[in-house]
């Protein structure tokens, strides 16, 4: 039997992304976003939800571009800080020692220290209530070469992406692999 929790915001896993954008004056800013994920494969798109009062919201609307930076678990304190203060009054890059790099693909910065970066042009905007969902068309993905496996493919365990546990309000990391996708299910008769 399941206990009814009501309409709470709880899904697992949740990412702990850093979303980066330039404001109208060209100042680079980052914010922490746990509400996001891939939402389309063709064209490749990612969605992030941002409160309208957030500094980054205004920047994405103004520049029509943003990056989604996937931090490693080792960067948890910096990611937490980026979600605690507003870019309106704090230069989060200077405060954390992170490096803003201008994308060559979109009008947005990315965090150089993050092992994986998705560079996005604003594709769609959906007003949901407390949050606006921004859908970004992924124009480029950058990955640190040390996060590639022997075959040259991205390795999630080398990236060691930071995750957010919204139920416990804590950060965590990915566990062990369980088996190959589109293979485990064969035991049921395929």
Language-model regions, residue ranges each:
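Basic, polyanion-binding surface patches
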Residues: 1-190
